Amino acid sequence: MDRQQQLRRLQGGLIVSCQAPADSPLHQPEIIAAIAVAAVQRGAVGIRLDTPEHVRAVRDRLPETPIIGLWKRTFPDSSVYITPRYVEAEAIAAAGADIVALDCTLRPRPDGEDFCQIIPRLQQELGCAVMADIDTLEAAIAAAKAGADLVGTTLYGYTEATQGQTPPGWDLLETAAQQLPNTPVICEGGIASAQAARQACDRGAFAVVVGTAITGIDLQVQAYVTALNARP
């Protein structure tokens, strides 16, 4: 299946991000895979995953489901952490991801790499589609020019350039969808209800990624407990 066929399978649908904090008991490949299977059985068109181990586990359970894979790694010389280098992207592709997600914000990467070089290598050498996780319209345009198959609003509100902003970035989504008619725009971040997911598509999203609101047990419980403990 070529890259365009993979993208068409996502159009208009829900992609569930199945991730857990590293210190969570849910951060086990077999548990993440079970969560992913449950999501697909209920209609999710794709799954977004962190780490090669989790991608591999889900691929074994869901051989036909589109997987967006990434690898979060931190480095002292860069604030980029979503698939920061080609070596991480290559490992995610080798684990079975159809689409590799990487930070395509306009920030310096570790080892001096550039997403403009990583994107074509993934497409040409490995045959993978690329989802560019961006924070601003400028970054979205740059990623599209570099050949990204998709752009996602994933990092809106999480970078220095968008500090103080709260996702979802509706204006960013709408403007990117208008200015990049040939590059599908994925809405990711801050989608906390089914109604918000539908609103994202109404505003131009090609598809919607939802994580915390569906699979984020650790963060959801913490939020409830914090609210209850704040009572006088």
UniProtKB/Swiss-Prot annotation:
E.C. number(s) listed in UniProt: 5.1.3.9
GO biological process terms on file: carbohydrate metabolic process; N-acetylmannosamine catabolic process; N-acetylneuraminate catabolic process
Which top-level enzyme class is recorded in the Swiss-Prot or TrEMBL entry?
isomerase
- Spell out the GO cellular component terms annotated for this protein, sorted alphabetically and separated by semicolons: cytosol
Please give the SUPFAM superfamilies that the UniProt record associates with this protein. Ribulose-phoshate binding barrel
Tell me the pathway.
Answer: Amino-sugar metabolism; N-acetylneuraminate degradation; D-fructose 6-phosphate from N-acetylneuraminate: step 3/5
**Gene3D superfamilies from the entry?**
Aldolase class I
Q: Write out the catalysed reaction.
A: an N-acyl-D-glucosamine 6-phosphate = an N-acyl-D-mannosamine 6-phosphate
Task: Give the Gene Ontology MF terms in alphabetical order.
Answer: N-acylglucosamine-6-phosphate 2-epimerase activity
> What InterPro entries does UniProt report for this protein, alphabetically?
Aldolase_TIM, NanE, RibuloseP-bd_barrel
Instruction: Name the CDD domains for this protein.
Output: NanE
Taken from the record, one Pfam family name reads NanE
Please describe what this protein does: Converts N-acetylmannosamine-6-phosphate (ManNAc-6-P) to N-acetylglucosamine-6-phosphate (GlcNAc-6-P).
PANTHER family in the cross-refs: N-ACETYLMANNOSAMINE-6-PHOSPHATE 2-EPIMERASE-RELATED (PTHR36204:SF1)
Tell me which HAMAP family the record gives.
Answer: ManNAc6P_epimer
Identify its protein family. Belongs to the NanE family.
Q: Mind telling me what this protein is named? A: Putative N-acetylmannosamine-6-phosphate 2-epimerase
Q: Which organism is it from?
A: Synechococcus elongatus (strain ATCC 33912 / PCC 7942 / FACHB-805)
